[in-house]
Each structure stands twice: as structure tokens, then as C-alpha cells.
């Protein structure tokens, strides 16, 4: 049997809606642990059950699917037997959210989505991302959008590019694109990004060598 882990940064709708349409959860031979640095396992289970049962979803996923297990984040980190180091850092986002760093065999991936970048975060973020292979950065906005979107909990593409200059990282992927941005607009943005930075897209896979 295989085991997979799903780490939730937070439970805003755009981060949980895909769970009920993930084919792996309906495979009884695939054991899946769900965890979050934001919620204890019982609270996480209760919230997921609310979203995926009753009026919101035809199946009660937490009761129906026996291959889904909820694990306290710090127990997941401590009990990990696969030589994988998982760390968390709180982001600047309404309702709270967490970023994650995952290191295995000296390869490091950092997830920093849903964060409204502020200068006071710089030192902690640099330390968190030091010697990383890939940073996944929240680039929902352009710099000119930031004034009107203060408090929305997201960063800009340009802020990501500036941060990339300050941290020891091989590659940055920009995610959480603004919903109104068209594919052609994203293609144009992608063509203008500095070396080492590109836009992430659905279905993208990256092999860290």
C-alpha cells in the first residue's frame, strides 16, 4: 500500500475544493494523511467534514472513506520515518495561513502561497527559504494592484522577483494567478520574467536534480 500526505496551508475555499475530486482519495489502497500546521487533527477533521458532507457535498468523505486519516502536524513531523524534514512558518493572510518547507536528501522545496508580503517578514522568510531548490511564491497581483488590494492577503510578482534576488534559491515558481488574468496575459508575463523565475501552471511537474 502507498501513503500520501496532504498539507493544508489553510481552509479557504480555493484550497480545499479539489479534495473531493482527487481520484486518489477513492482508491482504498492509497492511504492518505491530512494535516495542517493551522489546526489540530480533530479540528481539521471537523472542518473538512462540514465542507464535504450534507448540503455542500453528496458524500460524507470523513466517514465514508476509511483510507483518510487526520494527523496532528507536529506528530507528523516527529514521527516521519522517511528522512523528510517538514517545517512550517506562519504567513500574513486573513484568517491565518502557513507556509511549508520540505527537505529530502538535500533537496528543498518551499511553499509560500497566500502571503501578503511585508518588509517585516523579510528576515524570517529568507531564513526559511535559505538553500532551497524551488520556492513557490504567491504572485496574484502586480505591484500596481497592491494599493487597492491591501489586506487581501496576497503578494505581487514583482515582490517575488525582488525576494528571489535576496535569497539563496535556484528557482522560483509564481502561483495563485489572478482569476481575471487571461492565458495570453500570463504568457506575456512569463516571457518577461528574469532568469530563474517562471509562472506555474495546472499539471506542472518539476524534478529536482
Regions found by a protein language model. Give the residues of each.
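Binuclear metal-dependent hydrolase catalytic cores
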Residues: 1-110, 120, 125-126, 186-209
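Active-site glycine-centered loops adjacent to acidic/histidine catalytic or metal-binding residues
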Residues: 10, 114, 176
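Acidic active-site catalytic centers that drive phospho-/nucleotidyl reactions
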Residues: 14, 114, 138
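Structural motif
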Residues: 37, 112-114, 179
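Cap/insert and terminal regions of metallo-dependent hydrolase folds
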Residues: 117-204
Amino acid at each position: 500500500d502507498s501513503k500520501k500526505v496532504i498539507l493544508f496551508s489553510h481552509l479557504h475555499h480555493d484550497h480545499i475544493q479539489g479534495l473531493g475530486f482527487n481520484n486518489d482519495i477513492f482508491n482504498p489502497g492509497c492511504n492518505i494523511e491530512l494535516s495542517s500546521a493551522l489546526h489540530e487533527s480533530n479540528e481539521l477533521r471537523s472542518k473538512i467534514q462540514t465542507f464535504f458532507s450534507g448540503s455542500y457535498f453528496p458524500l460524507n468523505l470523513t466517514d465514508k472513506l476509511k483510507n483518510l486519516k487526520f494527523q496532528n502536524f507536529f506528530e507528523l513531523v516527529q514521527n516521519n520515518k522517511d528522512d523528510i524534514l517538514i517545517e512550517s512558518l506562519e504567513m500574513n493572510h486573513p484568517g491565518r495561513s502557513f507556509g511549508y518547507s520540505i527537505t529530502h536528501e538535500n533537496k528543498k522545496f518551499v511553499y509560500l502561497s497566500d502571503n501578503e508580503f511585508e518588509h517585516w517578514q523579510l528576515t524570517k522568510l529568507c531564513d526559511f527559504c535559505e538553500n532551497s531548490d524551488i520556492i513557490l511564491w504567491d504572485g496574484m497581483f502586480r505591484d500596481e494592484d497592491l494599493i487597492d488590494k491591501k489586506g487581501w492577503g496576497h503578494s505581487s510578482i514583482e515582490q517575488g522577483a525582488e525576494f528571489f534576488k535576496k535569497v539563496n534559491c535556484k528557482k522560483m515558481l509564481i502561483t495563485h494567478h489572478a482569476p481575471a488574468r487571461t492565458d495570453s496575459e500570463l504568457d506575456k508575463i512569463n516571457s518577461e520574467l528574469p532568469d530563474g523565475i517562471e509562472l506555474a501552471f495546472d499539471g506542472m511537474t518539476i524534478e529536482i536534480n
